[in-house]
A protein has these predicted regions:
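Polar/charged alpha-helical tracts
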Residues: 79-87, 172-185
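A short mid-domain helix/strand-loop element embedded in enzyme catalytic domains
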Residues: 149-180
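Active-site loop/lid in soluble adenylation, ligation, and acyl-transfer enzymes
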Residues: 1-158
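A long amphipathic alpha-helix within ATP-dependent nucleotide-binding catalytic cores
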Residues: 177-201
Length: 201
């Protein structure tokens, strides 16, 4: 089980991933076996969680690349990626247990918003609905059941907190943070990716 990694050029240690610099324009993102639940990193991990997380991420980044450009280049154990992007020789030296759970990505400017789409009445959406009859402030029909499919998916952005709880964001808060145009793109692209993945699954 890998809870924490210790490689050269650590840039960031998040709730689940450790991120390292590779040259001037690439990053190595290592998915650990740390567990983050309800925005809290728990003391125990889950064996192979990071491996599964990276494999799933790679699958969806490849599949949705026609909908939106992304930063994904490849998995760190992919021989093609090693040959093309191994200028620092780091990739060839990675232990297999680290390489298999790691992605090589382009450096990009991160938007500190979690673009969440909800198609089912569950989790915090269910809790809000029980309290107020709303999901992200939008009035919902009466008598919905937990886990029920929503008539239309709802864009429910949150802050992307480094530590602690992510906070719900209103549309206006998103606009204030990134501007009207990018706020619209975030919502439209998030809903498009959700619909595509929902149809695929």
């Amino acid at each position: 089980m890998i809870i924490e990694t210790h490689l050269p050029n650590l840039l960031h240690r998040g709730k689940v991933r450790d991120t390292y610099g590779i040259g001037s324009n690439l990053l190595l993102m290592v998915a650990t076996d740390r567990i983050s639940a309800f925005d809290v990193v728990l003391p125990n991990g889950i064996p192979h969680k990071g491996l599964v997380l990276s494999q799933m991420s790679a699958f969806w980044f490849r599949l949705t690349s026609g909908l939106i450009d992304n930063h994904f280049i490849g998995l760190a154990d992919d021989q093609r990626v090693i040959e093309e992007y191994n200028s620092s020789n780091l990739l060839a030296q990675l232990p297999l247990e680290i390489a298999r759970r790691s992605m090589i990505v382009r450096r990009a400017q991160r938007i500190d918003i979690e673009s969440i789409v909800r198609g089912y009445l569950a989790g915090s959406a269910w809790a809000e609905y029980r309290r107020n009859g709303t999901v992200w402030g939008q009035r919902m029909p009466k008598s919905l059941k937990e886990g029920q499919v929503l008539s239309e998916p709802v864009f429910t952005p949150t802050t992307k907190a480094e530590q602690g709880h992510d906070q719900n964001m209103t549309h206006q808060q998103v606009v204030d943070m990134v501007g009207e145009d990018l706020a619209r793109q975030l919502e439209e692209k998030s809903l498009a990716i959700y619909s595509f993945a929902h149809e695929y699954a």
